[in-house]
Amino acid sequence: MGTPYTTDLIYDDLFTRLAAEHENFHYHTAISRETHHNGQPGQYVHHLLEKQMDTFDPLLSNPRTLLYICGLAGMQSGLFQVMAQHNIGDGYFTLKDQLADIAPSDWDLSQVRRGVKTTERCMVEVY
């Protein structure tokens, strides 16, 4: 779950408890506007995905996994970029021809909006 501040984490106690009680429930947070206790700057969800790809790759590679992206418009582009760079976008989105010859790291928000088409396994609600 990604939020600007730890105080914005909804259902944090519940998700933390579920993660402790169930080995198949995993709860990860990305806090963007707070410095971490180790002095590292905040991070967005796509930064967390990139840093912990070894953890997320098996989950995202599973054909039964569904992805729900909700939040500010623009944040989905970072997720799509990281997923495409690691070749785990298949099943979640397809690319239109206009993005075929552009490296995912070079995609901008307008290109993502026009050139990425999500599948039934990827729900996006952005505002």
Predicted regions and their residues:
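Reductase modules of NAD(P)H-dependent flavoproteins
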Residues: M1-Y127
